[in-house]
């Protein structure tokens, strides 16, 4: 288990560290291996296969080939957030998880991928089961297998439909891709769809919920954010450091004997990277347990390269693929909450948490308020 910033960064960039669970020796059991019956997604692959699959998907998600996929979503995001907060009007208390933090990223990733929004109740059940594979103690192998099979059937139908009648979404683009990297097989399309759907919402929900909770615990920061909307960029960056949605990465393996911090990690052993601890390493940041968005003020401290300051999105070749989208969603949701909720306060502190050890965030977050400021459109 590695918990210090410098060593984690070193290992994230070390080619002798694999993300493929097949490299584990038998003694290191209990590591999630992805979805049973499907090939690993690129999250669980090493170069060169990782790089090829990531490049294929990137072509349809980010500049230079697809410059507007994320940026072009900004107006739609504002509309979705505005609509969800409009739903709070006339009430004095809401569950931020169920009524904003979860429905927002679900709506966005469905639209992006071309998954019908009304199918959420179906895939929600499968995803809940699949996430249990992150926690080997639940003993849910049969449930995980069943959920994987049902979700694969569902996505097979969806991919075939998009191939026959392609739209402007990512599943259509991936299913009909004839770019320089060659086509994805049907199995690769399935594992990529699973990865994007799950990574695309199960993490962002925690960033928005952890963010709301943290801001309500620091009312002076919330008040500053209300008066200075530009501050939201720093707030989200500091949240990724201070209350990250992904606490640790449990699926790395040493491909060789690796010397680090006067310790030898033997070949074949499992390496757990404690990203959240690394982001609070006192040798890396000043006063690490203080929530202080100003530490990301570029005018005061000169923000270095993306990802340099915290490990919220990991690092190296597996650096979060969806980081620009996650940032935009959290900035929009938290900015609008700060602007529109009048006198917001926590009803229960601490709130009940999800039981997942990797993905950390509240299961529910009851927030009371006096009124709702009308939306800009209103
Ligand atoms: C606040 C929200 C998010 C957080 C905190 C987060 C965090 C992370 C982290 C820590 C990793 C690295 C895992 C590793 O090193 O093994 C990662 C990888 C990844 N994330 Fe995110 N993520 C978020 C949102 C998203 C979104 C919205 C998407 C999709 C649109 C996404 C897609 C991915 C993918 C595909 C990978 C695998 C990248 C690779 O293996 O090359 N993530 N994410």
Task: Describe each PLM feature range.
Residues 1-378:
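Cytochrome P450
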């Amino acid at each position: 288990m590695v918990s210090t910033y410098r060593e984690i960064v070193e290992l994230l960039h070390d080619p002798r560290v694999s993300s493929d669970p097949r490299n584990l020796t038998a003694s290191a059991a209990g590591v999630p291996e992805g979805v049973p019956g499907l090939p690993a997604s690129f999250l669980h692959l090493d170069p060169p296969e990782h790089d090829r699959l990531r490049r294929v998907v990137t072509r349809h998600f980010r500049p230079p080939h697809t410059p507007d996929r994320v940026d072009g979503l900004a107006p739609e995001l504002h509309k979705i957030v505005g609509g969800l907060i409009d739903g709070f009007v006339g009430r004095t208390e809401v569950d931020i998880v169920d009524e904003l933090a979860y429905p927002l990223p679900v709506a966005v990733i469905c639209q992006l991928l071309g998954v019908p929004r009304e199918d959420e109740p179906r895939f929600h059940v499968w995803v809940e089961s699949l996430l249990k594979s992150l926690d080997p103690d639940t003993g849910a192998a049969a449930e995980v297998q069943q959920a994987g099979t049902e979700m694969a059937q569902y996505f097979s139908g969806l991919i075939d439909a998009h191939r026959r009648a392609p739209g402007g979404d990512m599943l259509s683009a991936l299913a009909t891709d004839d770019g320089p990297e060659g086509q994805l097989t049907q199995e690769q399309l399935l594992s990529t769809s699973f990865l994007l759907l799950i990574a695309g919402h199960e993490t962002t929900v925690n960033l928005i919920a952890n963010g709301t909770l943290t801001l309500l615990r620091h009312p002076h920061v919330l008040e500053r954010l209300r008066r200075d909307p530009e501050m939201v960029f720093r707030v989200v960056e500091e949240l990724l450091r201070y209350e990250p949605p992904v606490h640790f990465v449990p699926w790395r393996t040493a491909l060789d004997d690796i010397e680090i911090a006067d310790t030898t990690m033997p070949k074949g052993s499992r390496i757990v990277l404690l990203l959240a601890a690394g982001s609070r390493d006192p040798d890396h940041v000043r006063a690490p347990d203080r929530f202080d968005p100003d530490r990301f003020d570029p005018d005061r401290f000169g923000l270095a390269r993306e990802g340099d300051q915290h490990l919220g999105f990991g690092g190296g070749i597996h650096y979060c693929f969806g980081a620009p989208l996650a940032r935009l969603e959290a900035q929009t949701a938290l900015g609008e909450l700060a602007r529109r909720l009048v006198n917001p306060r926590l009803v229960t502190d601490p709130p009940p948490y999800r039981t997942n050890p990797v993905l950390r965030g509240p299961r529910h977050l009851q927030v009371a308020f006096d009124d709702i400021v009308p939306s800009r459109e209103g």
